[in-house]
From Swiss-Prot:
It comes from the Bacteria. It comes from Solidesulfovibrio magneticus (strain ATCC 700980 / DSM 13731 / RS-1). Gene3D superfamilies: Ribosomal protein L14. This is Large ribosomal subunit protein uL14. GO terms for biological process: translation. The keyword Ribonucleoprotein applies.
Length: 122
């Protein structure tokens, strides 16, 4: 459950470490984003000599949330951190590696590149 001003970890090797949500995409009054939703973020903390710079405004997809996500079979899944993967303007991941597990809901939302790069899909 990510909303405006939420801080997220970055789960790829794009060079950004922390990002802040500045908009939840998908509706004019949409308040929350969950796993698989696209948000607009501002880079708050980045490594030197990286692909993205501090202050850059980018799109990102949420891959992990602390708030549990219900599934069709009645089970729930939640993670220890709120994390996102940065996306280019074409919708492709900026980084070439994904760190940590990602949720299976990304496969249903057609983020196949992220699912294939992830070390574990839960």
């Amino acid at each position: 459950m990510i909303q405006v001003e939420s801080n997220l970890d970055v789960a790829d090797n794009s060079g950004a470490k922390r990002v802040c949500c500045i908009k939840v995409l998908g509706g004019s009054r949409r308040r929350y984003a969950t796993v698989g939703d696209i948000i607009v973020v501002s880079v708050k903390d980045a490594l030197p000599n990286s692909k993205v710079k501090k202050g850059a405004v980018m799109k990102a997809v949420v891959v992990r949330t602390k708030k549990e996500v219900g599934r069709a079979d009645g089970s729930y899944i939640k993670f220890d951190s709120n994390s996102a993967v940065l996306l280019s303007n074409q919708g492709e991941p900026v980084g070439t590696r994904i760190f940590g597990p990602v949720a299976r809901e990304l496969r249903q939302k057609n983020f196949m590149k992220i699912v294939s790069l992830a070390p574990e899909v839960l």
